[in-house]
């Protein structure tokens, strides 16, 4: 059985390697917007690193079709429906009610469930994935993939300027305002007999002034149009090159130390366009359906490895709706305890979005997600502050050590069978 102790001892050097590589990509390559040239260039570069520096016999660059603008496009659909519903309130309230219901439907499908319901409305582009595998020397009994997404997020101007509390507060106000208007529209429709009319104080003063009261939410509705900036892409150093290089650093260290496993294949999945609604991971699962069913295959999916206080395993993902694999999740927690690093049992909460772990789990893979960020938004999340000079080497080193130990434990169990 392989001895991984030197890899764990050299975790600081591994973290420094990650920082240097991440800095190189951020400074010297195009911005990695989902479905754009920068994503492809970075994937091709990392695929080359995996082949030449990490010893992967297989390092495939793969493409897929997507509509990346659709993921945040629900904002335009939903908010426009709400504003139109507010106007309709004064003339045909039942139409306003229907518009707002449709707006919420768009939000739930695109963001709540990460479905592709409205993707067809947005331009098609080509995203990029990478699948790399280091073969074992003997019979294949198991396989471990380390995963990260190479694309970077579009800038969130409100979070960038005012911070996460203001960003989240605006969303809460908008949702509450839209719900208030929706039920007010239904009530107004019932009171007015579902007929077209011009609502005035003389017709029904209570219904009229409730409509006027809804105008207080209008500035917040318009603010939602600026909640993301599709013309500006951030560096994405933490989110999510930190995750891409977690697996790459492990494979490079194994090669440097001359470690070859007898029964465990070790691979890296770089799933593009995560910021566009897990589109790369979803495409990867479709393209590789059944390919890795031959032996136990685990996926450790990393995202935003930055803050050691929040380093944790997400037992639930996708707004808390999708269960991660308990065995894989527990294995990372066990490894953390063995190397003496604090790791939290956590989840991606409602309205917290999702990581690629959710897409793998939904496709039937044994997968878990590992993150190290505060789910109460920090000012570096999806902003220009997520830069190569804002990395946390200590957190990278600790997460790396846990991942190495988890791989060692998996290999020991598989090899003993």
Language-model-detected regions and their locations in the chain:
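Acidic/histidine-rich catalytic neighborhood of metal-dependent amide-processing enzymes
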Residues: 103-131, 139-142, 152-157, 188-214, ...
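Second-shell loop/turn segments in exported
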Residues: 5-12, 29-37, 118, 231-238, ...
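A non-catalytic alpha/beta surface segment that caps or lines the substrate-entry region
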Residues: 31-135, 157-206, 344
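N-terminal hydrophobic or amphipathic helices/low-complexity stretches enriched
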Residues: 1-38, 47-58, 72-73, 134-135, ...
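Extracytoplasmic/secreted proteins, especially bacterial periplasmic and envelope-associated proteins
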Residues: 17-20, 24, 41, 45, ...
């Amino acid at each position: 059985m392989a001895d991984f102790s030197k890899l764990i001892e050299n975790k600081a050097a591994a973290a420094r390697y990650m920082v240097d590589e991440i800095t190189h990509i951020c400074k010297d390559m195009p911005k990695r917007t989902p479905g754009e040239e920068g994503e492809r260039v970075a994937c091709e570069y990392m695929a080359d690193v995996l082949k030449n520096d990490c010893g992967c016999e297989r390092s495939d660059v793969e493409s897929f079709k997507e509509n990346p603008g659709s993921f945040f496009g629900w904002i335009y659909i939903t908010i426009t429906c709400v504003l139109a519903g507010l106007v309709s309130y004064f003339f045909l309230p039942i139409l306003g009610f229907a518009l707002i219901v449709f707006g919420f439907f768009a939000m739930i499908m695109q963001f709540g469930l990460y479905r592709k319901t409205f993707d067809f409305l947005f331009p098609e582009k080509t995203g990029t994935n990478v699948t790399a595998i280091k073969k074992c020397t003997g019979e294949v009994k198991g396989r471990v993939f380390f995963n990260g997404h190479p694309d970077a997020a579009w800038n969130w101007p409100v979070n960038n300027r005012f911070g996460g509390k203001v960003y989240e507060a605006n969303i809460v106000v908008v949702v509450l305002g839209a719900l208030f208007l929706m039920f007010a529209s239904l009530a107004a429709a019932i009171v007015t007999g579902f007929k077209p009319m011009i609502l005035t104080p003389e017709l029904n003063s209570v219904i009229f002034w409730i409509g006027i009261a809804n105008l207080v939410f209008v500035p917040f509705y318009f603010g939602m149009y600026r909640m993301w900036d599709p013309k500006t892409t951030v560096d994405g150093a933490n989110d999510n090159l930190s995750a891409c290089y977690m697996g790459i650093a492990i494979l490079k260290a194994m090669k440097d130390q001359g470690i070859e496993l007898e029964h465990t294949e070790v691979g890296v999945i770089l799933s593009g366009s995560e910021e566009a609604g897990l589109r790369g991971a979803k495409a990867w699962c479709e393209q590789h359906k059944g390919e890795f069913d031959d032996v136990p295959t685990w996926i450790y999916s990393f995202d935003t490895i930055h803050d050691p206080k929040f380093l944790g395993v997400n037992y639930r993902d996708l707004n808390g709706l999708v269960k991660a694999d308990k065995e894989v999740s527990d294995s990372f927690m066990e490894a953390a305890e063995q190397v003496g690093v604090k790791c939290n049992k956590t989840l991606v909460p409602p309205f917290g979005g999702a990581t690629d772990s959710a897409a793998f789990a939904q496709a039937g893979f044994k997968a878990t997600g590992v993150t190290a960020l505060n789910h109460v938004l920090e000012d570096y999340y999806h902003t220009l502050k997520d830069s190569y000079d804002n990395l946390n080497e200590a957190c990278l080193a600790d997460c790396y050590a846990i991942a190495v130990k988890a791989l060692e434990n998996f290999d020991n169990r598989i090899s003993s069978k």
